[in-house]
Amino acid sequence: GLKLAVDQRKQAIEAAEVLDEADLSDNDKYERSYLIHVLQGELFWLTEADWPHKNPDYYTGALDPNVYIARPYADAETRMKAFIKYAKNVPAAARQIEANLQLPLPETYLKYGQAGFGGFAEYYGGDAKAAFADVKDEALQAEFDAATAEAAAAMQHLADHIGSVPATKDGYALGAEKFSDMVRLTEAVDVPLAELKAIG
């Protein structure tokens, strides 16, 4: 769950920080620094910004099935089987997301979430279905239809759920302290906000 995601990143940072620089090449030092920076940025969104509970965007990227459609890493039948496996896991993921997101959502987040989750619901039986139309295995096509129907229903339910409570007009702003932390932890820019504002 989310706690595991946080703990894994903290442990990875600790493991990287205890490496003896004397044993590292310049390239290794750079890669270690980059790794720590990326993990600190991910921790910011997970914890301080609390996106798993506040922002549907935290989930839409991971749910995007485009890799099975747009990237010909294997033949269509193999990718179709992978898509089916993905689709069969969508209902459980949708339930977890529903449990995590705290309503009401800010208006901008709600619109994004409904467009994303609702868009997936349409995509499964539309463009995704069309992408594998040339696969002649009827049993596989039937399995695809069943899996994507359940996945689409789960995503549409999620889109409806987050809209079941009227959105707030605010709640999306980080505030000065968190914004400063975001810039420092995700962009490695440790500059006072007043100076950043002056720079433009």
Give the location of each predicted region.
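N-terminal maturation segment of proteins
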Residues: G1-I199
